Structures are given as C-alpha cells and as structure tokens.
Amino acid sequence: MDKYIGIVISVDSAIAEVAMYDMVNDANILWDGQVLPGPKVGSFISILQGNVRIIAKVISEKIIDQQNSIGSKEFDNRYSKDSINRVIKAKSIGTVKGGNFQVTSRYVPMVGNKVSWISQDDYTAMYALGENVPSLRIGEDLLGDQEVNIPIDRIFASHIGVFGNTGSGKSNTLHRLYLNLFKSKYGEYALENSKFIVIDFNGEYSHEKSFGVTSEKKTVRRLSTRSNKSDKIPINDEYIFDPEILSMLFDARPATQVPFINSTLKSYNEKQGDWDGYARFIIGTLLNLLITRDTSRGDALSEWINLYKKFIDTERCDLDYIGAGPNDSYRIYNTQTCDWKYFNRNDSIEIHREYIYNVIFNDLSEALSNSDPIRRIRYIIKFSYIHSTAWGQVQKEHLDPLMKRIDVTLRDLDKIIEVRNDHLQDTCSLFIIDLRNANQSIKRMIPMLFAKMMYGEQKNKKGSGSTSHLIIDEAHNILNANSGELGDHWRDYRLDVFEEIIKEGRKFGFYLTLSSQRPADISPTIVSQIHNYFIHRLVNDLDLRMIERTMPTLDRASFDVIPTLGKGECVVTGTAFSLPVFTIIDWDESDPRPHSDDLVLTHLWVKAEYKEALNKAKDHPHVKKMSKQGMHNWLTSEPNLFSPEAAQYAVDNMRVDWKANALEKAKSCHGTPEEIYSHLISDEVGFTKEEASHAVSRLD
C-alpha cells in the first residue's frame, strides 16, 4: 500500500513542485513500524498517475511561510503550528509501469497527483537489468541502501572509464570490477577465452594476490631500466622494427634522421632472415672504402673495422693489417703469402671480393644469424651510418646525435623486451606489466606498442570468439593531449593509435578500461568514446568541465554531487544503465586489493604489540563473519592474549563493514528471524542491534 507524503502543486516541463505533508519533514520517518528515509535532495519519490508511477529525483527544497510574507515589515520567527510548509522540486526521470522501469517523456506530472515514497518494488524496477541478465554486484546504492549490480555483457563489452581524485577510491573500483568478474561463475571461462592486459604505472596491481587470480593464469612482468635483472615482455618483431616506431623511439628529426632510419629499416626488413645476403651487403661498404681512400671520409675505414670487431666479439682480425699505400690507396698484409695486397682507386671491386670474403664473410654472417634481434639491429644501424656518411651522402654531424640516442634507447630496450616473431597466444590470460621502475621514455612507448600489437592480433582473430581487454591505470600518463610540453615528441602518433582503438575496437572485440585522476588531461576524443563511467570525487574545474562535456548520460543534479562524494563513493552511468546510480563500492579487508592505501603514519608510530594485533585480526580465517566485539574478545583471549588496548586498536583500524559481516553470519544461521537476531546480539557473537537488524532484514 502506498504511503502518501505530499501532492503536486506546480509543474514546469519535467520539474514538479510537491507540497509535503507535515509528518514527513524529518530526516527519518517511523511509518507502520518501519524507519524510512525522509525525502531529501538526491533521493527519489514516486508520483502516482493512474496505473503509472512517475519516478522523480529531488533536486531542491524550500519552505513557504504562511505567517510571514516577503512584504512583512516585521519578521516573526516564532514557531506557529501549521505556519511552515515544505516544498520540494523533483525532476521526472522515467516511469514504472507493470513492474518495468523505462526512461521516457511520455508521462509528466500533473497538478494534484499524489506523491508517495518510492517502494522497494520501484527500486527493484529502477535498478533491474532485465530478466535473466548475467550481472555482478559492485556495491550498494548510496541513498536507498539497495544492492547495485552491473550487467556483465554491457559493461565488459564496452570501453570503461574510472575517474577520481587521489584517495577517492578509484583504484579499488577498477580492481573490484575485475576481481568480482574473475570470482564469478563466468571468471574461469573469461580467463580461458579472453586476454586481460594491465598496464600498471605504480605497481598497485602487480602483487601475488591481485585480482584474485592464481599464478597459473597470471603473469606479472616488472620492467626496470635501472637494473640488468629486469623481467622482459614479448614484442612481435614486425611492431618493434617498424620504421615509424623506431623513428619516434629514437626521437629522430624529420629532415635528415627519419629518412636514414626509413632506408635502413627498409633494407633490413627486405633482407631479414637472409643473413648471408645481408653480410654481402655490409661487406660491400668495406670494399668500396678500400678503393676510394681519396673520396671517402678519413676515419670511415677504421670505424668500420672497429665496429666489425665489436660485432663478432674479437680483439684482433686480419683487417688490422690494412694500412696506407701509395697514391691514396690502401694495402693489406697477406699473412698466408707474406706479401702486400694493394687496393687501387681504378680497381674493380670484383678483383678483391673473394679475398675479403675469405677473411671476414663467415664470421660476419654467423654474427648476424646468432645475435639477438636488438643487438643485431643496433649494429646494422651503425654499419648503415658508416655507409651513409663515408662519401658525404649524409652529413656526419646530422646523424651523430641520433646514434648516441640509439645506443641509449636500445640498451634500455634490451633490458625489458624479448623480440619474437610469433604472437601472444602463449602468454597467460591475465598479463600485468609493472612500469614503476621504467624511465619516462619506456613508460610512454611500451603501453602504445603493446596496445598496437594486441589490437592488430585481435583484428586478425575477428569472429574467433575471443576478446582482448586492455586495462590502463593512470591513463593520463600516455593519453595526455598536452604532453608535448613535457618533451613528448611522438604524442600525436600515440594518441592516433588509441583513438583508433577506442573508435573501432569494439567491432573486433577489443575493449579499453581507463583509470585516471586527471581526466581533463586525456584527449577529449578518447574520453567522449567511453561507454560506461565510474566517477569518484573530482574537484578540479577542468576535470569537471571535461566530464560535463563528454558524458551525455549524466544529468545536472548528479553532476553537481561529484565534488562532494566520499571515499569509495561514485556515480555509475553510461550506456549500460537507464539512469545514473550513486554507489558505494564494496570494500573488504580480507579481499585482495590494490597496493594503493594511504600511508597512515600513526600506524607506523605505535607499539609493536598494536601492529601485531592488527595483522593477527586481518588474518583471522573467519574475519568476514566476525563482529567487532567478537574480534576484540578473540584477540584478548588465549592463545593470543593481547592487551585490551592493542585489541581495541586492531578492531578500530580494520576497515571492515561490520553490517556486511553480520549478514554473512546470519546466512549461516538457522531458525526464525527473531532467533537469528537474538543469536547475533548475544554476548558470544557480539553484533550490535543495528547490525543485527540490518542483517535480518536482508535475509531471503
């Protein structure tokens, strides 16, 4: 039966003014033995119109003073019975008809319509995801204390954005989404049929228990440019040896350095695998140097010989016997015939080819064949540098800075990547890349490179029944539309890659999840293409303006609440939901969670016994069913025997939802609701009356 709380007295478009009955003007109302929340800004009311219930959201409230008008010369603020009338404004958001909620403008409030509290059935209809829709719980409604579930298909087959200031709880939300997915009945098959790649800039998700996935199905790669003991990640050679990628990676200048990289990589990619052929190509430079002493750069020959010795890893070779001959020629001492062989300017290369091949060909071809790809490309670029600068085709001064950058960059790359010519099928289903110890250049390059590679592979697998999910924490680090100010010279290419992915990826089963504390820094094109959002507290005007411009599913009233959200609270909105939902995300001390907790100094500055008691409490095998008092009693009894002060410190700092614990305990009890309630508040169990009532009221 409806509980009437007011009547519509004015309508302006979709906004109705409702005069409230006197008995509902408190924060909480006792009605038929139930404690109900009073209507307030942000809550919902139901406007009755025939067999249709118009659901409206309260957006403001005011009072009408019957005793004092605006024109009163003297304001009498003494209370007078029935002189104050409360009026609220509510905006229609949809209707409930036949038990189904629908966003529509077909029905609007009318003056005289009665207003009631929103019923449990109305809440159920509003948050219903459809009949037999697979869903996951992520938390509770902030205002109505209802369970909030998300539709698995409409969320995970979409691009997701998780935004919020530092300390707002966004890391827990990102982790909770995938933790609950992997814990669900669909988790095992999700890990079998899909790839989940996590780009972790701060090492928050790289620990053993992250996402609740065991090491058999999870791989963590901790990349470090500071150490030679870094883990390595697999990169397909067609992506890493792409001229455009290497030009950006080496910060090559467009006028002179990019053409050099392009020509070198073109030659390399054409001859790759034919190392005998490539050895002949490199030796061709040496032969030309030997007969052009008068026209080639003076130190080019010695530079070539020293590079060759480093490449084949030897300190001496027959080429060391090359010296200056008469008339701008070179000569070499033949150790087998004990005489000099001369290289004259007018000689044909063919005259000397066989001799030089006998001296160095086999060693050079073997080095090309056996070197790892990073070392091989490094030396090939250096041989190409000598070839390009020896006769002045390219000014040496133009390429020298590039060669220094190439050395540094490839040295860093060699620490962290393993170049392969196969694909990622053999990697674990959950692949986490920890970049906290990588330098800035690698942090910008690896996510883009991995995303490009994954996206290319997923496009090739279209229709195979598998999907790829790329999860990027602190996404503003690589999707920053203004990062050119930071010396990031290949921002545009990286943004193009991700903009293509977010525009076209859904067609091929490739989905992005982006988390950031600075959404305003991310390219507006990318933010506007996100389908579903989890918005935590944001206070920066630039961030709020970005959200306002790019989220069409967020109404003004919901938007205005964002700066006031508490820790763990967020508004969930997007294409998967019929209306924005204010949610407090589940948080459980005993669940795996990201390593993103704020450092509490006073926890460091307490007695060792206090710390030990807290750790003991967290490790209790039945922590999810314990009451606060029950945990205190356990800590102070045998065999623990902590002091009462240490036990109190532990239970005060556990960050446990004791109401949720009461519900878990109640589910394991048998008997009538009254018997379960009595058991929960008993001295043995120790839940409070409020916690016990909460639990019993939610039992099926």
Predicted regions and their residues:
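A short helix-turn-beta junction within AAA+ P-loop NTPase domains corresponding to the substrate/partner-engaging
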Residues: 215-223, 525-537
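Conserved P-loop NTPase motor module
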Residues: 567-608
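Conserved ASCE P-loop ATPase motor domains encompassing nucleic-acid-directed helicases/translocases
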Residues: 1-129
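Glycine-rich phosphate-binding loop of nucleotide-binding enzymes
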Residues: 135-225, 572, 604-605
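Conserved H-loop
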Residues: 201, 510, 517-518, 529
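P-loop NTPase motor domains
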Residues: 203-209, 237-497
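An alpha-helical, amphipathic repeat domain used for nucleic-acid recognition
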Residues: 609-700
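Substrate-engagement module of ASCE P-loop NTPases
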Residues: 181-185, 453-459, 492-512
